[in-house]
Amino acid sequence: MTGVATVLFVYAHPDDESFGIAGTAMKLKDEGHTTALLTLTRGDAGLWFGKERGSWTAEELARERAREWHAAADIIGFSERRLLEWPDGGLWDAPPVRVTADVVQMIRDVKPDIVCTFGPEGAGSEHDDHRAANLFALRGFHRAASAEAFPERGAPHEARRLFFNASPFAADFPILAMTPTHAIDIAKYEGRKKRAFECHKTQAKDRDRFYQLLERRGGREFFHLAIDRAAGPAGSASLLR
């Protein structure tokens, strides 16, 4: 795969993008490629760091997390972004056809060459929303290419590659670990990645884990090439080849 590419990242919650792929997305943008982000829930079932339970509503948290998400996305530099309103904490039980249709819509609108999402294990956390995001991204990847699927959502588009987040460290992904095929050097972007994560102030309870992962991974983000319609070699330092 050569030339300018479009890469779509599909995740479950505001802050997933900063935790996992911010450095890679920044690097792709600096190299002249187009990046897009689809987040499936507003994160309104989580906690609000520094505030007592009952002192805020789910809708107030959703609005605040949306502001944080937009601020982080501005730093990362996504050309296109969508924040959907499927149930946080209940994505696994959301209507599968409707959620898949939303993913298909995004793929057909932005026409990515590459789609990235969580692995089937849910990025090591076994979080049901993360696992559901993997399933919906996988379904959308396939359905978007079919003229028979969701014709009301636009013309078919066949993305070339599907990547899952991965890690070479067993402590990060204790079960169903995806072996990394690609290691992206993001050392140059770690400062901005930190800034993006720090936008998510409501989720500061995860701050220690974020910095532990950052240190352990040594200036790299890892991916597993799950589907390759482009038939390129694995083991690359770029998602594009």
Which role does the model predict for each range below?
Residues M1-L8, E80, G89, D93-R241:
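Metal-dependent de-N-acetylase/amidase catalytic core
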Residues M1-V110:
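Active-site rim/loop-helix segments in enzyme catalytic domains that contact anionic ligands
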